Amino acid sequence: MNFLRPHLRALVPAALRRRVRDGLESVRWRFPAPPRALPQYGLTTTQVYPQGTNFDLVMERALAGKLEGLRLSARTPVASIGTCFAEEFAQFMQAGGMNYVRTEPDALASSASWGRVYTIPNLLQIVRYSLEPDFPLVLERSAGGYFDPLRDHAPLPSASEAEARDAVRRHREASRKAFAECEIAVITVGQNEAWIDRTSGMVWGRMPPKEVLEPRRASFEVREFSLSENRAALEQALDALKRANPALRFLLTVSPVPSFASFSDSDVVSRSFANKCLLRALVDEAVAARSGHAFYFPSFEMVLCYNPTSFRADNRHVKYGSVDRIFGLLERTTGLARPRSSG
């Protein structure tokens, strides 16, 4: 048969051959061989990249050992805080009737009324105002009334400044209680761009509303946090929580949800994933430095690495269709585009 192959290749157009190859890879992806080890190198099945639908099976085997020290059961008091993907965890815990800590109502099912916590510096602010009685209480005023700018999806604005201050104090006590009552804190990091009040130095929980931003635009800046800024903020947040609750264990995750928009770059897709890589590296450092009480759950990898549309059956190499898309974009955005014949 081998002698026929060159003749068949000459008869079948290259584009068709590539499509057929991608189709065969999709079939192979659905019916992989069992997970393999490489004993000659001392590697187990969880150390060799999983092929096809073996992905979840191999991940399960790997995590069974890594998460053993977490000691998480349906009865373990758990709190969660973080980006929109943290909502999914909260809803999963509550739907299953598990011991999910909630110390006050929250529109997004969080353990306290934190809303979505997008950045690590914003997380640190929440930890600090929960544990430090003298942390500044900052209020802003919009058309609806007074509100807490440090939180996303905070309750409705209060009619008076006094009411708003009382509401923030109650929230901060509920926040402190949530961190104190849990045995495991699930922290999901996900974004790296925030609005900063230049006057107070506070990181806002979300973009300032139009009626606040427009007359004071010079008072605000959009900041993308550096590796060192994020590292320092994450270390301070985890260390402060551990001092306040010495038995506390951490389950850290990185949200797979990209940025909705970027004020820091004209290319939101590339900027978003550059920030994801930065956050993923920081979480890896934090877990390694806190062996025995900090653990990582790979929700980020489970979403982005499980991609039979783009990957071949080995879940590593890229299908021809995706290769064509990649280099088609390179041609269209550079001077590499092939000149078309005028005829």
Model segments located where?
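Extracellular glycan-modifying ectodomains
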Residues: N2-G343
